[in-house]
Amino acid sequence: MGAQFSKTAAKGEATAERPGEAAVASSPSKANGQENGHVKVNGDASPAAAEPGAKEELQANGSAPAADKEEPAAAGSGAASPAAAEKDEPAAAAPDAGASPVEKEAPVEGEAAEPGSPTAAEGEAASAASSTSSPKAEDGATPSPSNETPKKKKKRFSFKKSFKLSGFSFKKNKKEAGEGGEAEGAAGASAEGGKDEASGGAAAAAGEAGAAPGEPTAAPGEEAAAGEEGAAGGDPQEAKPEEAAVAPEKPPASEEAKAVEEPSKAEEKAEEAGVSAAGCEAPSAAGPGVPPEQEAAPAEEAAAAPASSACAAPSQEAQPECSPEAPPAEAAE
């Protein structure tokens, strides 16, 4: 060791009294090219002398940041920064003596424990602040749902109103359609029943105007045939023969006496009732194809009269055209 120090002194460097200073003095010798280990004597001596001081420095400097990390974890506030600054100062003075760092670490820790009380108080204050902020947050959260709930309620009420209005409108339409087609249970039946009533009313008006008995019979027959063709769609040929059979019976009924007309009317009513029932049942199948404009107007008329009267009205209206009993037909309407 003495020979090494003498060599370094011969190079113009002061002798090192302490191992830490020896490491500092040996560092320039390494800079001369001995770092690669060519001269192992100087390389082995310098690290051996430098290790204790370096360890002490590491302990002095490393213990302080470790304590700094422990304190912020315990305190949880920004007050640890001044305590860390106070610790750095004694840590810088620690390398002066080997035993001094250990002795100073204890008071540093004690000091850290002492300021830990205000930091703990600050931590409690922060916790109290958080607790005070939590009710504030709760208070802030409570109005937010209160503000949201009325909006939701308003939306719900608005939706309910809109649905109720639409529901009432649909229900009214359904009720009218149901009243018009109680026997069939479809809106198309009411529409066709209204068509039959309209055709029968037009024929009755023509008969009352004083037209010839043959013309009104042909007119309602054609109208009924057209209505049944449009309603049945696929059974126009079957409807025509029935109407043709009913039409020839009407002229003799108008020529014969009332006594003879009564049984013929009963038979005609039965036949026409069957035809009208078929005509009312057919539109129930072909109801979806009926245009809405034609359904709307008859639906209002069908709301006042049930399906049975709607189907029976055309038969009663078609008969008075040939017979002189027009007032009872009007009364039936």
Swiss-Prot record:
Residues 252-272 have a biased composition (Basic and acidic residues). Belongs to the MARCKS family. GO terms for cellular component: actin filament bundle; cell cortex; cell junction; centrosome; cilium; cytoplasm; cytosol; endoplasmic reticulum. Residues 73-84, 91-101, 109-135, 199-229, 292-333 have a biased composition (Low complexity). The modification N6-acetyllysine is found at K171. Residues 151-175 are annotated as: Calmodulin-binding (PSD). Phosphorylation by PKC displaces MARCKS from the membrane. It also inhibits the F-actin cross-linking activity. Interacts with CDC42. Interacts with GTP-bound form of RAB10. Interacts with calmodulin/CALM1. Residues 151-163 have a biased composition (Basic residues). The modification Phosphothreonine is found at T15, T142, T149. GO terms for molecular function: actin filament binding; calmodulin binding; identical protein binding; protein kinase C binding. Residues 26-35 have a biased composition (Polar residues). The keyword Lipoprotein applies. It is found in: Cell membrane; Cytoplasm; Cytoplasm, Cytoskeleton. Membrane-associated protein that plays a role in the structural modulation of the actin cytoskeleton, chemotaxis, motility, cell adhesion, phagocytosis, and exocytosis through lipid sequestering and/or protein docking to membranes. Thus, exerts an influence on a plethora of physiological processes, such as embryonic development, tissue regeneration, neuronal plasticity, and inflammation. Sequesters phosphatidylinositol 4,5-bisphosphate (PIP2) at lipid rafts in the plasma membrane of quiescent cells, an action reversed by protein kinase C, ultimately inhibiting exocytosis. PANTHER family: MYRISTOYLATED ALANINE-RICH C-KINASE SUBSTRATE, MYRISTOYLATED ALANINE-RICH C-KINASE SUBSTRATE MARCKS. A lipid is attached at G2 (N-myristoyl glycine). The modification Phosphoserine is found at residues 26-27, 29, 46, 63, 77, 81, 100, 117, 127, 134, 144, 146, 158, 162, 166, 169, 264, 315. GO terms for biological process: actin crosslink formation; actin filament bundle assembly; actin filament organization; apoptotic process; central nervous system development; mitochondrion organization; neural tube development; neurogenesis. It is a lipid-anchor. This is Myristoylated alanine-rich C-kinase substrate. Its main location: membrane. Keywords: Acetylation, Actin-binding, Calmodulin-binding, Cell membrane, Cytoplasm, Cytoskeleton, Lipoprotein, Membrane, Myristate, Phosphoprotein. The keyword Cytoplasm applies.
